[in-house]
Regions:
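A general, composition-driven signal for non-globular sequence regions
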Residues: 5-7, 109, 148, 213
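Generic hydrophobic/packing signal
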Residues: 4, 15, 53, 61, ...
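Active-site beta->alpha N-cap acidic-glycine motif
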Residues: 32-149, 234, 253
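Catalytic domains of cell-wall/extracellular-matrix polysaccharide-remodeling enzymes
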Residues: 119-217, 221-239, 243, 250-257
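A general structural signal for well-ordered secondary-structure junctions
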Residues: 85, 111, 213-214, 244
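N-terminal, intrinsically disordered, polar/charged segments of Gram-positive cell-envelope systems
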Residues: 1-57
Length: 257
């Protein structure tokens, strides 16, 4: 399989990677170790937005992790009915079915960010190298499927979890150096716990009211039927409370743990 060409907006910086300067160090452990990952995946870069953040007051950001899945098209239908754009942090596979769903998400005007290729916490958080390898796989699939290079991502388990304590800071530093921005959330639907319609609806509305810019975590796996069933009513209720809806980008101030 051949990878799609990387668009002009995604490029390595002109500066020499940190790993080359590390060779000059008198400490052999430094020269052979910590920063060697900076030379990995030389096309894995994004143009970092450095302007002012857009006004996100009274704006809801619906985010869906772990898809696409057999429920993606149903979810897209309800979003389309309400004329709402959302953000999908995907766990993509190299299958035509997945590629077609990624294209459908993108063509509908939603934002696609990287979540993970494997969602294997122990594997991806073992080192910065391991994280980059997993991220690059998901990144390339999205790029090949949609022609658009994602520049935002969400850590599996969130940016603070039991698996990334030793590697978290180095991963964030390296991903920031490469131009990528991560988003956590401030409202958790807890749909992963299998809650029914009423509980999801009540919890999301109650928690969303605490923020002027709620970033709501949902999931788009194949067993999250209730998320699909409740989403339209949640959108209508939040609209009635005066909220607008948007999709995440680097122009939105990120919610980070």
């Amino acid at each position: 399989e051949t990878s799609a060409a990387v668009p002009e907006t995604t490029k390595a910086p002109e500066t020499t990677p940190a790993s080359s300067s590390a060779v000059e160090s008198t400490d052999s452990s430094v020269s052979s170790g910590a920063d060697s990952y900076t030379s990995l995946f030389p096309t894995l870069y994004a143009d970092k937005y450095d302007g002012e953040y857009e006004n996100s007051e009274n704006t809801v950001y619906l985010t869906f992790d772990d898809g696409p899945s057999v429920l993606t098209e149903n979810l897209l239908y309800y979003l389309r009915q309400e004329n709402v754009k959302a953000t999908f942090f995907v766990v993509p596979e190299r299958t035509e079915y997945c590629y077609s769903l990624l294209r459908e998400i993108s063509n509908a005007g939603h934002t696609i960010g990287v979540h993970s290729a494997s969602h294997d916490y122990e594997k991806i958080y073992a080192s910065v190298d391991a994280f980059l390898e997993d991220f690059n796989e998901a990144y390339e699939i999205v790029l090949e499927a949609t022609g658009k290079a994602p520049d935002i991502y969400r850590f599996p388990g969130g940016s603070v979890n039991d698996y990334n304590e030793k590697t978290r800071d180095d991963i964030i530093t390296e991903m920031d150096r490469r131009g990528f921005t991560y988003f956590d959330w401030n409202v958790d639907s807890n749909d992963w716990q299998g809650y029914g319609w009423t509980t999801l609806y009540t919890n999301v509305l109650k928690d969303a009211e605490e923020f002027s810019s709620p970033v709501i975590l949902f999931h788009n796996t194949g067993d999250r039927d209730n998320t699909v069933l409740v989403i339209e009513d949640i959108i209508k209720a939040l609209k009635n409370k005066g909220y607008k809806f948007g999709s995440l980008s680097q122009k939105i101030k990120p919610v980070q743990f």
